[in-house]
């Protein structure tokens, strides 16, 4: 029973990859690297993601650097599938990451270089993490964002976290 969620996730990704035709472009970039600052832990995070070839399969990686809660090297790699223009022009991404973490992320290009995102993730410690982010595209390559996340984790890990990020789209 423990492995039912990973099996369902992989099956969903495989079915989506074979069934979804090329959707219209949403204007969102998934090929990017970023540096974020977490106001709660006073630490940084490095992130990178990219679509594989011309597909909707998304690979990602992240790592923490310093901070008073996480320390160095809270690393993660992920594999996901982007469903473009699912509803109201928003993209939805389902993903599975290292250490039995699962996620759903919804992103919407609001126009005028503004983007909104909402996410739900569940990690191996049975912690639910909710998040929201507002981003501004300074140029086609540079994006600035502010996000907030909260979880049901015990202690400092469950406190609300504000993250300020700068990203480079490639």
Predicted segments with their positions:
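Outer-membrane beta-barrel proteins
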Residues: 2-170
């Amino acid at each position: 029973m423990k492995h039912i969620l990973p099996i369902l996730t992989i099956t969903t990704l495989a079915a989506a990859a074979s069934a979804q035709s090329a959707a219209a472009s949403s204007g969102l970039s998934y090929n990017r690297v970023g540096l974020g600052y977490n106001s709660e832990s006073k630490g940084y995070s490095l992130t990178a993601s990219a679509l594989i070839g011309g597909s909707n399969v998304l690979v990602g990686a992240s790592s923490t650097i310093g901070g008073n809660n996480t320390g160095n090297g809270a690393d993660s790699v992920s594999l996901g599938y982007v469903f473009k223009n699912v509803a109201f022009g928003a993209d939805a991404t389902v993903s599975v990451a290292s250490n039995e973490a699962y996620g759903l992320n919804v992103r919407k290009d609001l126009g005028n270089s503004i983007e909104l995102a909402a996410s739900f993730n569940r990690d191996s410690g049975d912690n639910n993490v909710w998040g929201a982010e507002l981003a501004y595209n300074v140029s086609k390559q540079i994006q600035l964002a502010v996000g907030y996340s909260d979880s049901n984790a015990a202690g400092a890990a469950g406190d609300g976290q504000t993250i300020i990020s700068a990203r480079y789209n490639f």
